[in-house]
Amino acid sequence: MTWLSRDTVPTGTGFLRLSPAADVAVPLSSADLAATVELSRETFAAAGITATDRVVVALNSDGDLAGAVLTQALTGLAGATASVGPRGRMRLLAALDAVGATALVITPTGAADLLARLHMEFLVDPLDLGLRTLILVGEITDQRTCRHLAAEFGARVIGVYVDPVFGAALAWRDATDERNPLSPVRDGLLALADLAEDAVLAAAPGKSAELVLTPVWHSTLGDATIRTGEVVDLSADSAGIPAPTHTVGDHVLIRGRWLSLPRLRAVLAKIDGIAQWTLEIRRDGTLDVATLKVAFARPSLLKNPMWHGRVRQAVAAVTPVTIKVEVLPEVSETSAPPVIDDRRGHHLGSDRHGR
């Protein structure tokens, strides 16, 4: 058994699935891609999607959340499918109407933001959309949000686990009850591992464990165990594999996208004059908000638009997620290591061994 993380997956040859920052390149042969689609189709079928459903997929089609792959999996299972991308709630509303959608695949914060805009901007009753099923993917969410979405839309709220390496939908659950474990569509796809050592856990009540992939269906990585960076909390009465509640390692999850912290550190290290920086992540409203707080080492840089622009461009080069850059008003005379300040309480840190 070979233990890997996303950073150490061999690049291989043929078609490569790239992350948005191109820091992860996973080989997917034609057979692997077909297996990814078939696994996802089986998962959606197990979650209750049938030929009577008309599905809109409001996800990105690159990297972490492969909306195009999930749409392909739904095609032939549902009566109709459409992929519209994640941006533009008014456009999404128009797409739901045009398709006559009964099911929507979206991130939890995307669904919450759509709901807020329906009430405050569009003056549309969510019940009038006629959605029977909300399929939430790609983010850590809570039972209260899922129950609120279910009540407002009058719909089933299903959580589908899409793995961050291959982009396959592997498991599902009723998301309105946090006690409901993930139900993998096949045996042997998911497992739990110790955070500090390469060992699969049979049971570990009262501990945290990392969700790992065992992609037996993959042509070249079938004997690997791949760490996902997603962490579950195991209570004394945990049954099966719970939904992830935290992240760990060198990637942090923001708006359903994985940000590579080593890449961010590397590009900011090339900008002369940065003494220290903090990446602050919040979820005060419906969406994640990320702010990079930068302290410069020289007074001349505090109001230098060119230097501020360099920081913004560096951040934009490593992630499609919008990250606001805030220059602190005072000079920092001492350098300090970068800080990840996750106010959501999701990210446990880069060091697995310290957990």
PLM segments and residue spans:
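Active-site glycine/GP-rich loop and adjacent strand/helix microenvironment
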Residues: 84-355
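Active-site diphosphate/adenylate-binding microenvironment
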Residues: 1-35, 39
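A short helix-loop-beta submotif of the ANL/AMP-binding
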Residues: 72-82, 102
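Conserved AMP-binding loop of ANL adenylate-forming enzymes
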Residues: 38-73
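Redox-cofactor binding/interface segments in oxidoreductases and associated redox assembly factors
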Residues: 14-15, 57, 106, 136
